[in-house]
Amino acid sequence: AATTPGTPGGICHMLANYGTMSLKQVLAPAMQLASGYPIDAQTANSIERGKDRIKEWPYSKKVFLPHVGEKREAPEAGEIFKQEELFITLSKMVEAEQLALKKGMSRKAAIMAAYDRFYKGDIATEFVRGCQEQGGLITKQDLANWKPIEEATTHVNYKGIDVYKLQQWTQGPALLQALNILENFDLKSMGYNSTKYIHTVYQAM
């Protein structure tokens, strides 16, 4: 099921309120990868195995299957893999931030200008168009209404290490419960990925 995208807003919120860098700096590595990188064999082969499902979605097909009609339709290992639309979206967010900075806005306000462009501006318009074109139900109002929520984490101490996870709306508590179970076993003595090790972890999870 598709949900209102929260990752861009979450990143902007955390960076604006708790970070020191600009959005341009933070997004630079992602933009570099989106502009093209040599794809690894594992990812390329995974795309090839899932190509029939990918073909059901025209935009995904365009990105992930550059050799449609050939025996192998996914990228070859080492082939330059590009996500041009992702690069454009990230560039628009950076552009919004940089324009805000030129107007004299603070670092925080400039980052939130990028946030607004994603959730209320032309990015939102294009997102909704593409979503609804494919039968999705997300509206511009859904995007405009989305807000990040800060909440207290939950945690356990596993063998002297504090492990923090989000609350019950995620699988976080299940992982913490598994760690509580595994606290009673000496996994190290079993040998990493040994039969006994895998069986014990599997049973706990």
Where are the model-predicted features located?
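Feature marks proteins synthesized as precursors that undergo proteolytic processing into two chains
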Residues: 1-205
